[in-house]
Amino acid sequence: ESDNIELIWKSYQLSPNMKTNPDKNINQYLAEHKGISLERAKEMNDHVTNLAKQVGLVYNFDTAIVANSFNAHRFSHFAKHYGKQNEAEEKLFAAYFTEGKNTDDIQTLLEIGEEIGLDTSVLKAVLESNKYADDVKADIYEAHQIGVRGVPFFVFDRKYAVSGAQDNSVFQQTLEQSFAEWKKENVGVAHPDKK
């Protein structure tokens, strides 16, 4: 029944004024930004790394580059226009969390675009313009309207929210509950031949 689940990506920035700094990793940035020790920042990110590992993800915060995400969000909206947003997001997350790539760098975004089959000449023109900036800003505005203050943040069927790095079971339970309720409210929609 997972065919009835639609994933919608939305843009959000924790630190919209953050300057990209390829010489600084995310542990260093977090320590400075939160006013905590580097050791404490590493502990916090190690917790997230361990949660990610439980679901088969590899996070390398020691090499994750401090990068403003606005251009990456514009790239994601461009990819959405061509039906490639899921692939774009997966590649962006891998580039940032695993591969230590600068996701604010146009060349990095062009490489990802090429990997997922986007027209890189059109993508380059988009990234060198302000195209999709309004889409990103609209998503951020919507997030503020519903009370988003951190990432990750997930909304299920516009009813249930899961915030922060949570155990996989929290997502499973929320997804199952929201889908069961949706199915009950939409009898005949999920499977028109079954009533």
Report each predicted region and the residues it spans:
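C-terminal cap of thioredoxin/glutaredoxin-like
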Residues: E1-D3, W9, S76-K195
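Structural alpha/beta surface segment adjacent to cysteine/selenocysteine redox centers
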Residues: E1-Y96, P192
